[in-house]
Amino acid sequence: MNDKHLPDASAENPWLPLRQLTPARIALGRTGTSLPTRPQLDFQYAHAQARDAVHLPFDHASIGDGLRQRGRDSLLLHSAAADRHVYLQRPDLGRRLDEASVRRLREHAAGYDGQIDLAIVVADGLSALAVQRHTLPFLERLEEQALAEGWSLSPVVLVEQGRVAVADEIGELLRARMSVILIGERPGLSSPDSLGLYFTWAPRVGLTDAYRNCISNVRLEGLSYGMAAHRLLYLMREACRRQLSGVNLKDEAEVQSLEGDAPRTGNFLLARD
């Protein structure tokens, strides 16, 4: 049989134009009854990126250097999880500091007069890649706006093998009114470098997720640094006014559209032309 008589086994998906609107794996096409080679290889590559993001060591030195260049101090601590293997199997240990870190933080806090308004914590979480890519540019925007509010800031506390709740202990030891932790989120197949922000009013050991506000997917392909800082500042202002955070504090920040229209809130799906 000549090749010219063979039917074309490759078929494109009619949803192909929608791929420009989302990184989701849609409209991949097919070859016979299978995926084409390119989408299959892309999937395997994305899976490898996600696995690597979980096990990539936390390069805290580069973040500390970047902070020093901006005149900001940092403090390196470690959770009670001794290494990555323990961290992944014992989430509870990632939520608390080890004894040496507790002593160091107490000594540091003893030098403060009064109360810190905002404790800033950075932890590797499940994606050190996210923290290394996005921490410095995001903090530049956040700290500029926080200082404009007249709030006092702690040194940036860098935590190895840390989970979200470790910020509660840090905030309590620093006697901070508020805490925010920047942490690498669990990698997905389209987002190995997604940064999460968790904000807490009156942080203290023992709080549950119900007392925290989360802003997720901070990255170039997701929520921009400026928009994330805008939403976080709104939550912090409201927390100071209402003395609470978590499920009782909703993000109702006004958002300026890309076209420069008037600020709007609510569900964009319900907006009319």
Curated annotation (Swiss-Prot):
Its EC number is 4.3.1.7. Gene3D superfamilies: Ethanolamine ammonia-lyase light chain (EutC), Ethanolamine ammonia-lyase light chain (EutC), N-terminal domain. Keywords: Bacterial microcompartment, Cobalamin, Cobalt, Lyase. It catalyses: ethanolamine = acetaldehyde + NH4(+). GO terms for biological process: amino acid metabolic process; ethanolamine catabolic process. Its main location: other. It is an enzyme of class 4 (lyase). The basic unit is a heterodimer which dimerizes to form tetramers. The heterotetramers trimerize; 6 large subunits form a core ring with 6 small subunits projecting outwards. This is Ethanolamine ammonia-lyase small subunit. It comes from Pseudomonas paraeruginosa (strain DSM 24068 / PA7) (Pseudomonas aeruginosa (strain PA7)). The gene is eutC.
